[in-house]
Swiss-Prot record:
The keyword Transport does not apply. PANTHER family: NUCLEOSIDE DIPHOSPHATE KINASE. It comes from Sulfurovum sp. (strain NBC37-1). Major role in the synthesis of nucleoside triphosphates other than ATP. The ATP gamma phosphate is transferred to the NDP beta phosphate via a ping-pong mechanism, using a phosphorylated active-site intermediate. Its EC number is 2.7.4.6. It catalyses: a 2'-deoxyribonucleoside 5'-diphosphate + ATP = a 2'-deoxyribonucleoside 5'-triphosphate + ADP; a ribonucleoside 5'-diphosphate + ATP = a ribonucleoside 5'-triphosphate + ADP. This is Nucleoside diphosphate kinase. Its cofactor is Mg(2+). GO terms for biological process: CTP biosynthetic process; GTP biosynthetic process; UTP biosynthetic process. One of its GO terms (molecular function) is metal ion binding. It is found in: Cytoplasm. One of its GO terms (cellular component) is cytoplasm. Its main location: cytoplasm. Belongs to the NDK family.
Length: 137
């Protein structure tokens, strides 16, 4: 069964919409195989987003991701990665379809409520970054 990673970002955690977001995953047929609430260190955030290290937004992204707790979740199901990306909506909430997570809960392109793996290959890397195999059921 395909797995993907979701992160509920600090802005959405602060709005107290964790349950609403997780419920959308389940309603779409995705199973929560693992989840935890954590606070990223600067080192963790820089390592997780290392692919963007040379991009102009990198420092702001890292600063935002360490600004408060996040909820990291392994979602499992048929076409889990694509289904999660559809539920999230466009990166910029102003362009996200109504009813998507970002349209409903995000404030800006920076504070955009959720992260989701962008490929099956990256999903495996991202899941292994946050979870040991024994934590995923």
């Amino acid at each position: 069964m395909e797995q993907t990673l979701s992160i509920i970002k600090p802005d959405a955690v602060a709005k107290n919409v964790i349950g609403q977001i997780l419920a959308r995953f389940e309603a779409a047929g995705l199973r929560i195989a693992a989840t935890k609430k954590t606070r990223l260190s600067r080192v963790d955030a820089e390592a997780f987003y290392a692919i963007h290290a040379e991009r102009p937004f990198f420092k702001d992204l890292v600063d935002f991701m360490i600004s408060g707790p996040v909820v990291v979740t392994v979602l499992e199901g048929e076409n889990a990665m694509a289904k999660n990306r559809e539920l999230m909506g466009a990166t910029n909430p102003a362009e996200a379809e109504p009813g998507t997570i970002r349209a409903d809960f995000a404030d800006s392109i920076d504070a955009n409520a959720v992260h989701g793996s962008d490929s099956v290959e990256n999903a495996e890397i991202e899941i292994n970054f946050f979870f040991a195999k024994r934590e995923i059921h």
